[in-house]
Design a protein with these regions (language model features):
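Surface-exposed, low-hydrophobicity beta-strand/loop segments enriched in small/polar/acidic residues
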Residues: 1-151
Length: 151
């Protein structure tokens, strides 16, 4: 049936940033850092690395730098995070050399600064960060943060 009048467009807004608890010990999280949940203690975040079974948590929106002596138990400190699955498009550094043909490809945690294509990473399960939506240069792209289909 064709529209004969304007209709109300209903949408859900993207998730808002949220505070996540940080692992214990010496931690320096920079603004823009990719964060993973700690593998052995889900619920606490740390700077991301490409390790099997780690789960991407989001991108840090604030800096946190604490010494081990001041951070003796998990959850003492929190950091503001743009969460996994937020739907936002974020300009990201890509470890691999990419081309416009990579638009639509998934990218995964490479480290706290970069994402990578599946061929260059170990963790292609929980490490999914998002989908390349726009090629910018050989090592830079707009990436849409998406929820992992199995999480």
């Amino acid at each position: 049936m064709s529209l004969s009048a304007n209709k109300v467009i209903r949408r859900k807004s993207a998730p808002t940033p949220k505070k996540l608890k940080v692992v214990d010990g010496a931690v320096h999280i920079h603004v823009g850092a990719n964060l993973n949940y700690e593998a052995s203690n889900i619920g606490y975040v740390m700077p991301a690395t490409d390790v099997l079974n780690a789960e991407f948590a989001g991108i840090a929106l604030e800096e946190l730098n604490v010494a081990a002596a001041d951070n003796t138990s998990d959850g003492t400190y929190e950091v503001l995070v743009l969460p996994r699955g937020a739907g936002d498009e974020v300009l990201m550094d890509v470890h691999d050399a990419i081309t416009i043909a990579n638009e639509g490809d998934p990218v995964y945690v490479y480290d706290d600064d970069d994402v990578g294509l599946s061929a260059s990473v170990t963790n292609t399960t929980g490490g999914l960060v998002g989908i390349i939506r726009q090629f910018v240069s050989a090592n830079k792209a707009w990436v849409q943060l998406v929820q992992h289909p199995t999480l």
